[in-house]
């Protein structure tokens, strides 16, 4: 207990020295976050040991200490990466590198130079809202290179330039739906009107604009810090879901037809059974000879009408009907034998003999199934790859057949989130989940059709060899917080 108190007091003294010096260097800010990490680890250890208070300092719960330690580790890694860039020599204060500033809009970016932006709704000075625009925003590109960008404001919202693209982090149209009755607002910078009153329906194709006030909730927005807003990809996913639902509904008539045919076969069997029973009761020795002659005639007619190939095809196509009629005949003959007393054994033996001669053998049925299934094992042509739109069934297909079926529809996972979060997830997956995926794409975004604004959040594609591999990946991998996913497939990768 005394050792914990001494170490905790030492960390507090180091923090006080940093606060009093107020050095504006990245070295000092990295040291500050290192001390905060040590403090969180110490409090976590104390809580594990059952200590609830160190001096006058109450010990937080394990979850709080763990979250603070992880936050400190993440900030140290980001600051160390920034220190290696050309912007590492710039002045950086405690406010610039604080967690609150880092998490404010735009989230997960270092920024400097806050400026207040006032937006007045419905030309009412009392109905106004204040926003913070940052003069400079620092971001990392796909090659882990740091860039410094200037932020700006227009009638649509607040943005910063990411190359040649405008990355909006505040959209005025979103708050106009809450605070405005007419959908009009004006933007003021330093109490000067920069943009005259505009309506949310004026720029229909711009980020945050509306085409119709009744369908405002369905229109895609371009903000990057909100997970609940729809993007163009989300709308396409909804349309794909509706298409797949339509395709699923199309399968039902075929299943109903099979059920109808089965019921018809059952009815015909029951009718034939009743007829055979009535006939078997009134059969005599003369009618036995007639039935034998009829069977011989039907046999000769079947051979004379069609070729042996056609006969074998008919027998293979309708094994159920042949077996049912054969069993009925055997039942009739056996019952006649039983009525005669002494000839009951003969009747039974005749029934068994007819079953063995006329019923289709199970080996023939298996051969026909193998012949029909062997066509699936010849491979998939290049033109057929990606043509399947249904999930592969695991029934009546071997391992090779399933792989060939899955080749028709290469699966992917689309993940959406912040660019830095997706890159970290990609790097972690390459080391921890190797073999569970085929490849990762770079981080990318949609671009407006009539502008250069980036739409929605950053995206990344993950490709797989098969659906089983994608399912195993999705069940095993733990996605970062704020990252959502959706499934899909392509004709080719």
UniProtKB/Swiss-Prot annotation:
Keywords, in A-Z order: Activator, DNA replication, DNA-binding, Early protein, Host nucleus, Phosphoprotein, Repressor, Transcription, Transcription regulation
Bias kind Polar residues: ranges: 229-244
SUPFAM superfamilies linked: E2 regulatory, transactivation domain, Viral DNA-binding domain
Database matches in InterPro entries: E2/EBNA1_C_sf (IPR035975), Nucleotide-bd_a/b_plait_sf (IPR012677), Papillomavirus_E2_C (IPR000427), PPV_E2_N (IPR001866), Reg_prot_E2 (IPR033668), Regulatory_protein_E2_N (IPR036050), Regulatory_protein_E2_N_1 (IPR042503), Regulatory_protein_E2_N_2 (IPR042504)
Spans annotated as DNA-binding domain: 409-493
Low complexity bias: start-end ranges: 215-228, 315-336
Listed Pfam families: PPV_E2_C, PPV_E2_N
Keyword field contains Repressor: yes
Location within or outside the cell: Host nucleus
An example Gene Ontology molecular-function term: DNA-binding transcription factor activity
Posttranslational mods: Phosphorylated.
Region (Disordered): 196-395
GO-annotated cellular components: host cell nucleus
Domain of life: Viruses
Region (Transactivation domain): 1-201
GO BP, one annotated term: viral DNA genome replication
Gene3D superfamilies the UniProt entry points to: 3.30.70.330, E2 (early) protein, N terminal domain, subdomain 1, Papillomavirus E2 early protein domain
Basic residues biased stretches: 245-280, 287-304, 337-355
Free-text function comment from the UniProt entry: Plays a role in the initiation of viral DNA replication. A dimer of E2 interacts with a dimer of E1 in order to improve specificity of E1 DNA binding activity. Once the complex recognizes and binds DNA at specific sites, the E2 dimer is removed from DNA. E2 also regulates viral transcription through binding to the E2RE response element (5'-ACCNNNNNNGGT-3') present in multiple copies in the regulatory regions of the viral genome. Activates or represses transcription depending on E2RE's position with regards to proximal promoter elements including the TATA-box.
Family the entry assigns: Belongs to the papillomaviridae E2 protein family.
Subunit structure of this chain's protein: Binds DNA as homodimer. Interacts with protein E1; this interaction greatly increases E1 DNA-binding activity. Interacts with protein L1; this interaction enhances E2-dependent replication and transcription activation. Interacts with protein L2; this interaction inhibits E2 transcriptional activity but not DNA replication function E2. Interacts with protein E7; this interaction inhibits E7 oncogenic activity. Interacts with host TAF1; this interaction modulates E2-dependent transcriptional regulation. Interacts with host BRD4; this interaction mediates E2 transcriptional activation function.
Name used for this protein in its record: Regulatory protein E2
């Amino acid at each position: 207990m005394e050792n914990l108190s001494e170490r905790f007091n030492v960390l507090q003294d180091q923090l006080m020295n940093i606060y009093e010096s107020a050095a504006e260097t990245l070295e000092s800010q990295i040291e500050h976050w290192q001390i905060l990490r040590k403090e969180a680890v110490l409090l976590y250890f104390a809580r594990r040991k059952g200590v609830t208070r160190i001096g006058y300092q109450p010990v937080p719960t394990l979850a709080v200490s763990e979250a603070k330690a992880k936050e400190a580790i993440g900030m140290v890694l980001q600051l160390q990466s920034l220190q290696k860039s050309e912007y590492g020599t710039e002045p950086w204060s405690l406010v610039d590198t604080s967690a609150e500033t880092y998490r404010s809009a735009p989230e997960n970016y270092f920024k400097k130079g806050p400026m207040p932006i006032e937006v007045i709704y419905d030309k009412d000075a009392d109905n106004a809202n204040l926003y913070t625009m940052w003069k400079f925003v620092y971001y990392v590109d796909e090659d882990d290179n740091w860039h410094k960008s200037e932020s700006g404001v227009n009638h649509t919202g607040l943005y910063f330039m990411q190359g040649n693209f405008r990355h909006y982090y505040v959209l005025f149209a979103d708050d106009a739906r809450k605070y405005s009755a007419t959908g009009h607002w004006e933007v003021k910078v330093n109490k000067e009107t920069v943009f005259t009153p505009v309506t949310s329906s004026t720029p229909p194709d711009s980020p945050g604009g509306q085409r119709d006030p009744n369908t405002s909730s369905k229109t895609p927005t371009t903000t990057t810090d909100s997970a609940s807003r729809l993007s163009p990809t989300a709308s396409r996913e909804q349309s794909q879901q509706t298409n797949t639902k339509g395709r699923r509904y199309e399968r039902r008539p075929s299943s109903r037809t099979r059920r109808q045919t089965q019921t018809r076969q059952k009815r015909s069997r029951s009718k034939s059974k009743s007829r055979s029973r009535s006939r078997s009761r009134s059969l005599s020795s003369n009618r036995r000879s007639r039935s034998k002659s009829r069977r011989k005639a039907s046999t000769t007619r079947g051979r004379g009408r069609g070729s042996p190939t056609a006969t074998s095809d008919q027998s293979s196509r309708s094994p159920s009907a042949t077996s049912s009629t054969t069993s009925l005949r055997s039942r009739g003959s056996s019952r006649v034998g039983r009525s005669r007393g002494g000839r009951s054994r003969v009747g039974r033996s005749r029934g068994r003999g007819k079953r063995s001669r006329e019923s289709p053998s199970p080996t023939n049925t298996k051969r026909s199934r193998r012949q029909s299934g062997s066509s699936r094992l010849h491979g998939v042509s290049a033109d057929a790859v990606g043509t399947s739109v249904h999930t592969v069934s695991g029934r009546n297909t071997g391992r090779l057949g399933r792989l060939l079926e899955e080749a028709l529809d290469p699966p992917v996972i689309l993940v959406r989130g912040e660019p830095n979060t997706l890159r970290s997830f990609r790097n972690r997956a390459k080391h921890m989940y190797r073999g569970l995926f085929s490849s990762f794409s770079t981080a990318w975004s949609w671009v407006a059709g009539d502008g250069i604004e980036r739409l929605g959040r950053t995206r990344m594609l993950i490709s797989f060899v098969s659906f089983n591999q994608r399912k195993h990946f999705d069940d095993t991998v733990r996605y970062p917080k704020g990252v959502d996913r959706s499934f899909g497939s392509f004709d080719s990768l």
